[in-house]
Amino acid sequence: MFWTVFASSYTGLTDMSTEPLAKNLRPELGDFVSIIGFRSLLKGLREAVGEKTALVVAIAAGRARGRELADSFGLAGKEPELDKITSCLQQALGINGTRFCLIDKIEAIDDGYRVYCRETIGSAGEAQGSTGKLTFTLGTIQGTLESIMNKRLRGKQVESVLLGGTHDVIEFEVLG
């Protein structure tokens, strides 16, 4: 039950289908929830199941969302250029989409990919010097890349705007 409530509260999909987000799910309040509400959900999750389990669950939920995005883009398994993936993620997650975060660039690195994000939910409103990490955001991007590039990845945040970076940077290592 939690999984369905968690996922549907963010995706707007109650059946967990891969259809793109519907529009006008709520006639007066609109389709999206606030950062405050989303972060409260993550905080409650940490309090209920513990920090490590919450991290795993948030990343897994993000990966599921990322796979939905890849399917909605029609790019699952197609391995397009990284500029195309960047453009799709910008459209879906950025100012014209869910306003989840801004993706400035995805680049290939020796053993995987590096993604440059701004205005992420994980960093919004956090104090400078905070050691909080991206979880759902990392998972969303990971799930999208895994599905599109048909590769298993391991992600980690390597830079943070909270620690003086210009971006929240996530690196994904290709496994096997």
Where do the PLM segments sit?
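N-terminal accessory segment detector
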Residues: 1-135, 154, 159-169, 173-176
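Active-site helix/loop of acyl-thioester processing domains in fatty-acid/polyketide metabolism
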Residues: 135-150
